[in-house]
Amino acid sequence: MRPADTWKDYELLDATDGNRLERWGETLLIRPDPQVVWKTPKQSPLWAKADAIYHRSNQGGGEWEYRRRLPEKWKISCGEGEDKLTLIVSPTGFKHTGVFPEQAVNWAWYQQKIRAANRPVKVLNLFGYTGGATLACAAAGATVCHVDASKGIVAWGKDNAAASGLADKPIRWLVDDCAKFVAREKRRGN
């Protein structure tokens, strides 16, 4: 297993009893995580200082409890130099923040493979979400087709591209159902 250790602005501080304590820039968030099945004593005194806590609802979904006023969105950075990405964080109604920080190790791997190819590389990113993988590939020189079914999420991805200085890179942003998109492209011979 390779850790996602290229983050300057994100840190998993502690995890226990179904929850994660994370630092997103200067903001501390507590979010539920079903993979955190152990019940150990909380190791960090920062649990009590969290800026916001996401509470799941028994009916599905949930809501954020804000302990202090937070901006609607803020930026964090991952990587350095030509690999640096600036991503917009915004707590959503379904516990996510717009970034899956554990994916940074995959983004770095994509970049290494794209740069080592010594030829033009095209990437199809299905279910592209807010574009972390898309931007990593574009920063490494790939031409990217980013597909997600949510118009708002694709707009967020474009905002991330602008924040990262990658708005002019060859990225095709598509709002479409991924399965239908692939079926259409297959029929077209692409």
Report the location of each language-model feature:
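A generic structural signal for alpha->beta connector loops
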Residues: 120, 141, 168-170
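Non-catalytic substrate-recognition/targeting regions of SAM-dependent transferases
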Residues: 6-22, 29-101, 108
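Conserved SAM-binding loop of SAM-dependent methyltransferases across substrates and taxa
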Residues: 130-142
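S-adenosyl-L-methionine
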Residues: 150-190
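Conserved alpha-helix/loop element of class I SAM-dependent methyltransferases that forms part
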Residues: 101-118
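Conserved SAM-binding motif I beta-strand of class I
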Residues: 143-148
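N-terminal accessory targeting/assembly segments
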Residues: 1-4
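Conserved class I S-adenosyl-L-methionine
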Residues: 119-129
